[in-house]
């Protein structure tokens, strides 16, 4: 394929631009890049062609070297790798300092980096990054210049066919050589602890990094390598080093994806997938690859993929840990696997693996280059922190040490016991446990509380990368017989008080369940160092198998409760007592009231799962075969279906096979057994309280949206939610609004300002708005009397608020009505606040309701009107919709100028932001895994989030009092296929799938596939197909679809919601009346957002 080559000198540093000139003279037709064509041929990009492309870029971005040297210019462009590197090198040739920025960064993150580097100019693709550009323009600050990047056709006019005799004009040479410590390139950190930080690379760094073993080492590696590095992002330090530096210094070819932008400069580049990475390797003949571990985890169990990897000379990974199970399996299959280590802060200091490493399966171990000076800081056990020191031949990009120049990595390594010079990374000095959800648990405080037990000698929490944490406990005096389940249970009970105390001081995701307490073995005590402190890494390594086994038990949910002491008998009275004990323990020690909803007493889905599993484990511990068989009849949603102890005891007793369930007569005849009666009972309870409140507060005149001074003061609940964030941004930008009180619940995990900022960044809203003086955050408990506020704050609200927008509400379609009583109570408290206003007129009260409040409407009666319905049967169905109906009735009867806004499905915002946990993104992700999309005979009246927000504000700030009820749904709905087909097409295009992929099937067929995958589903199955968790919801959708198929009706919303009348709403809201239909552009935004957030 390639002609002979001449290597640049390796005995002295040589700069990137000098390397280009060297190859232009010595290796003009050696291919720096190759990519496959549609006809299975290859296109080669020679050093001659690439160097000329770099010069063409320089001519375009800075003609005749006009202007000032050293200008910092950001490069934000989602384009082909070939073009990206040519532009970056061309900018350097033109004495421009490029700042490579990931196009996935949020607008505030980009703004932060621009400000920190005094960068006011951006090279980009305006039509592709329109939302980013408009967002940056909207932030104010220094004026920014946006310049379109050169196109592939401009830079490579003879793509793959450039010859030396073709016309070409070199770019003028620089008058002076840049200083060694001048910055030649900016990269940035990942932003895992805040906004990404700019990282400057000087010319000295460039010279030294080109000589690093992780780059120069490819030069003489045997066998000769062709590098399949197409999947690396070019703006990342790894992509920059591997795709540009390595071929330049090692004279080696890199295989890329075929560029897509030659004929259409706005076309997106190929998105790497597990399939197209391997396909590109096969087509280009590349024999070396470097990828992130997630791809290897996908390939490890695919025979065809493993066969491809076996034929590679080197399979390298970096960027994160690879599980031992996967790595060992690949090595056992004959894959030449090895790890590479490096970061933007210090480059690529490790060597490529040698023959000994590959032949002995030492894939986790690495060897640092001889030129790399490391200070290994012993941690008191077998681990060492790696600290890289600056030398005359190795300059760090970042230096963070006080006593010497260098970079402390915080990475912990261990030495290989027999192979001198080999090291393995095993963790961080910062032992914060990052869960699979991304939530972070700080163990120190919880470990300290548990250690205070007289029965405990040592405590180490674990759970990094898992769904929940656990704790390893060493008993103080007598050892526990680990073969005796009763002894284990007794010890757990002895230390439970301290564990419970630790849980009370921790966020919900950090709490430790009794089943997650692992006890040390007498023959494997905890490792200790220094003054007797535990050595965490060494101990956790020793208990690796036991910890893995514990998580496997958790994953196999039907086995988890086996260590729970069962009830003495399976009667209702005994079960009530036993279940109450279990529930109290799972609710963090809160004494559970038997006839009150568990989810109103601190339960969540994880607690419900553990309680169900304890029931199953208790049944299976009995010798009675009939009782053991009954364990298989425990439904998945048992606790959701029976959400208090009395109902649960009755249901379990029936399943256990008791001849006559001893059901309390009051419960049997209560409203909980009659859905309509249940709604009316809860409504009656709070209506009675409301009547007493109205008598106490007296009368007011009809309200308007503003005070006498004409200024509006708004109390907004739920501002940190999806819709709430758009409402808050709109209110803060509105000049009519003088002040906004954002009332949100308290959270142990973070302050409300932090949560609000994170939501704004995710939705690319203007974070600067959150610094306005007109915004006041309030953390409160709306369910408590006076909303749990102190007298001063409460009075301040009574004396100033003119509009209340109540948006906060729990969203969970699995829960029964009783679980939403705290939300109903919170609505009552807010109504009470409004009625106690000291203003001349009471505040205008807007309740954000849902079309779900009409879920029981008889379709034969036509469309659902914009009126308050007094017949509770219209709301019979899910607890969510029923609770919204009750709140509607409460605010209507309050005497306030109150309006209930029944919202339909809220779609993604301007940047496509659509919460990943919502049912529709879950359907899309699951469809990708199932290989089919469901078709439904119904329509959708979805509205983009920012339009919903605007419509609500139209009503909130209307001059005249709006009516009691309005339906805020899209007045021009579209059919399900008109939405889902563009979504499916966008997924196929973004994932580079064959056009015939992901066919449509009937909803019932799709649900049947889902049910098959749900049987014996593991944690990994549920991660890939999250629709399993909403199986009942999707079954209901399929049931409605079958009814519609039989009747031929098409005038029903997806999910069975009837058509909603919107005439009144349209007359008040110009936003609603002027709304365009959703379509292909919206679908593309949603899919782009989901992919950027890692949904699939």
UniProtKB/Swiss-Prot annotation:
NADP(+) binds at residues 720-723, 807-809, 880, 884. Its EC number is 1.2.1.-. GO terms for molecular function: ATP binding; oxidoreductase activity. It is an enzyme of class 1 (oxidoreductase). InterPro entries: Adenylate-forming_Reductase, AMP-binding_CS, AMP-dep_synth/lig_dom, ANL_N_sf, Far_NAD-bd, NAD(P)-bd_dom_sf. The modification O-(pantetheine 4'-phosphoryl)serine is found at residue 605. Pfam families: AMP-binding, AMP-binding_C_3, NAD_binding_4. Contains three distinct domains: an adenylation (A) domain that activates the substrate amino acid which is subsequently covalently linked as a thioester (aminoacyl-S-PCP) to the 4'-phosphopantetheine prosthetic group of the second domain, the peptidyl carrier protein (PCP) domain, as well as a reductase (R) domain of the short-chain dehydrogenase/reductase (SDR) type. This is Adenylate-forming reductase Nps9. It comes from Serpula lacrymans var. lacrymans (strain S7.9) (Dry rot fungus).
């Amino acid at each position: 394929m390639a002609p002979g080559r001449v290597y640049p000198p390796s005995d002295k540093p040589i700069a990137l631009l000098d390397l280009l000139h060297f190859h232009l003279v010595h290796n003009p037709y050696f291919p720096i890049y190759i990519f496959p064509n549609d006809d299975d041929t290859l296109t080669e990009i020679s050093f001659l062609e690439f160097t000329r492309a770099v010069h063409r870029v320089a001519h375009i971005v800075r003609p005749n070297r006009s202007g000032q040297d050293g200008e910092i210019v950001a490069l934000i462009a989602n384009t082909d790798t070939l073009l990206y590197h040519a532009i970056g090198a061309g900018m350097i040739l033109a004495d421009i300092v490029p700042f490579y920025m990931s196009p996935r960064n949020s607008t505030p993150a980009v703004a932060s980096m621009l400000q920190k580097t005094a960068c006011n100019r951006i090279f980009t693709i305006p039509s592709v990054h329109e939302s980013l550009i408009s967002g940056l323009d909207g932030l104010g600050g220094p004026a920014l210049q946006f310049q379109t990047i050169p196109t592939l056709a401009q830079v490579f006019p003879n793509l793959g066919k450039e010859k030396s005799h073709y016309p070409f004009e070199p770019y003028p040479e620089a008058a002076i050589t840049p200083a060694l410590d001048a910055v030649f390139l900016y990269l940035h950190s990942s932003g895992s602890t805040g906004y990404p930080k700019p990282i400057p690379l000087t010319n000295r760094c460039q010279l030294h990094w080109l000589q690093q073993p992780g780059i120069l080492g490819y030069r003489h590696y045997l066998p000769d390598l062709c590098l399949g590095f197409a999947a690396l992002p070019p703006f990342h330090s790894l992509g920059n080093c591997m795709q540009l530096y390595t071929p330049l210094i090692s004279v080696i070819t890199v295989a890329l994806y075929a560029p897509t932008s030659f004929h259409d400069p706005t076309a997106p580049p190929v998105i790497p997938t597990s399939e197209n990475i391997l396909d590109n390797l096969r087509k280009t003949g590349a024999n070396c690859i470097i990828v992130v571990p997630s791809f290897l985890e996908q390939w490890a169990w695919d025979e065809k993929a493993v066969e491809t990897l076996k034929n590679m000379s080197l399979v390298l990974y970096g960027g994160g840990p690879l599980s031992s199970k996967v790595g060992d399996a690949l090595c056992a299959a004959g894959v030449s696997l090895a790890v590479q280590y490096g970061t933007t802060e210090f480059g690529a200091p490790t060597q490529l693996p040698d023959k000994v490493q590959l032949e002995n399966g030492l894939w986790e171990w690495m060897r640092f280059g001889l030129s790399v000076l490391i200070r290994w800081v012993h941690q008191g056990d077998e681990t060492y922190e790696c600290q890289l020191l600056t030398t005359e031949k190795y300059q760090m990009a970042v230096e963070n040490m006080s006593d010497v120049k260098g970079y402390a990595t915080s990475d912990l390594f261990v030495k290989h016991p027999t192979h001198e010079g080999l090291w393995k990374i095993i963790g961080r000095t910062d032992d914060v446990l990052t869960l699979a959800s991304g939530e972070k648990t700080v163990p120190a405080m919880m470990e300290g509380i548990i250690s205070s037990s007289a029965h405990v000698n040592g405590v180490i929490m674990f759970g990094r990368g898992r769904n929940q944490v656990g704790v390893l406990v060493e008993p103080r005096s007598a050892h526990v017989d680990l073969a005796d389940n009763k002894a284990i249970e007794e010890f757990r009970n002895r230390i439970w008080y301290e564990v419970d105390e630790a849980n009370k001081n921790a966020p919900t995701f950090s709490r430790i369940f009794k089943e997650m307490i692992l006890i040390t073995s007498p023959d494997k005590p905890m490792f200790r160092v220094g003054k007797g402190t535990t050595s965490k890494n060494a101990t956790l390594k020793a208990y690796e198998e036991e910890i893995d086994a514990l998580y496997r038990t958790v994953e196999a949910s039907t086995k988890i409760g086996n260590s729970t002491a069962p009830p003495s008998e399976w009667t209702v009275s005994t079960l009530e007592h036993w279940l109450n004990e279990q529930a109290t323990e799972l609710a963090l020690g809160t004494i559970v009231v038997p006839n009150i909803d568990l989810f109103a007493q601190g339960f969540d889905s994880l607690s419900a799962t553990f309680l169900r599993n304890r029931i199953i484990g208790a049944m299976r511990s009995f010798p009675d075969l009939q009782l053991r068989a009954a364990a298989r009849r425990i439904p998945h949603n048992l606790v959701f279906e029976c959400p208090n102890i009395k109902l649960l005891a009755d249901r379990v007793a029936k399943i256990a096979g008791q001849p006559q369930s001893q059901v309390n007569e009051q419960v049997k005849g209560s409203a909980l057994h009659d859905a309509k009666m249940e709604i009316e009972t809860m409504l009656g309870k709070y209506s009675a309280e409301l009547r007493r409140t109205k008598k106490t507060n007296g009368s007011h005149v009809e309200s308007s949206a503003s005070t006498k001074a004409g200024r509006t003061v708004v109390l907004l609940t739920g501002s940190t939610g999806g819709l709430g964030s758009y409402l808050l941004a709109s209110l803060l930008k509105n000049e009519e609004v003088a002040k906004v009180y954002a009332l949100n619940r308290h959270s142990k995990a973070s302050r409300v300002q932090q949560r609000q900022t994170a939501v704004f960044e995710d939705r690319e809203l203007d974070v600067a708005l959150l610094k306005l003086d007109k915004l006041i955050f309030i953390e409160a408990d709306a369910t408590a009397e006076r909303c749990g506020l102190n007298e001063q704050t409460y009075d301040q609200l009574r004396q100033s608020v003119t509009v209340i927008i109540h948006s906060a509400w729990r969203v969970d379609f699995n829960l029964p009505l009783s679980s939403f009583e705290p939300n109903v109570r919170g609505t009552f408290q807010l109504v009470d606040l409004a009625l106690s206003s000291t203003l001349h007129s009471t505040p205008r009260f807007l309740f954000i309701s849902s079309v779900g409040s009409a879920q029981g409407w008889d379709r034969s009666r036509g469309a659902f009107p914009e009126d308050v319905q007094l017949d509770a049967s219209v709301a019979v169905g899910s607890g969510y919709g029923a609770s919204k109906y009750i709140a509607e009735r409460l605010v209507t009867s309050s005497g306030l100028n109150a309006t209930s806004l029944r919202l339909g499905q809220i779609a993604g915002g301007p940047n496509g932001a659509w919460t990943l946990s919502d049912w529709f993104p879950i359907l899309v992700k699951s469809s990708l895994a199932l290989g089919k999309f469901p078709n439904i005979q119904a329509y959708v009246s979805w509205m983009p989030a920012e339009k919903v927000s605007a419509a609500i504000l139209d009503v909130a700030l209307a001059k005249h009092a709006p009516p009691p009820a309005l339906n805020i749904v899209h007045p021009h709905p579209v059919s399900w296929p008109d939405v889902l087909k563009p979504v499916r097409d966008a997924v196929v295009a973004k994932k580079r799938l064959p056009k015939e992929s992901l066919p449509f099937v009937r909803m019932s067929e799709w649900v049947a596939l889902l049910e098959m995958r749900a049987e014996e589903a593991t944690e990994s199955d549920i991660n890939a197909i999250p629709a399993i968790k909403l199986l009942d919801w999707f079954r209901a959708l399929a049931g409605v679809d079958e009814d519609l198929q039989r009747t031929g009706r098409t005038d029903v919303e997806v999910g069975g919601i009837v058509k909603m009348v919107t005439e009144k709403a349209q007359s008040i809201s110009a936003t609603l009346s002027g709304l365009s239909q959703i379509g292909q552009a919206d679908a593309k935004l949603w899919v782009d957002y989901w992919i950027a957030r890692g949904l699939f």
